[in-house]
């Protein structure tokens, strides 16, 4: 990353430094740098963004973060994101739908909503994604998670830990406690 007057100018490769004949501590022609920025930074930012979305769906927030990590300035980032949206490479509504569909059987609604909100996905798109992908029975999911986390024979001793685990996953206490108690009741009925 090249810094001019202690501010990030953008990412430069070794070949760019040779091409521009840059030397640490020496003054540089601002016009030459501005022209270089126009010629290369926008194309490189687009290439990096497309490489990021090549293998998996990304949201606008992910692309912005990736380009910021690579030291691109806000103008380059905004232009790149707008082009990606224009060509439908980035669509937060589609991202929300894909995310909900792929996580709905393993995570609670609350956990999915929190993850999408952290990526700056609008509440409207999150709700639409849940409408497109109806929630399975949460009780079944909680029962499966309890059985996966702890065998029924050990559940009595680890009850509080299992409940805390499921509460952290975003499931409501009443549902979790009912499921744990049902498993314990079934276990004692068998014995």
Where are these regions (language model features)?
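An alpha-helical, amphipathic repeat domain used for nucleic-acid recognition
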Residues: 1-191
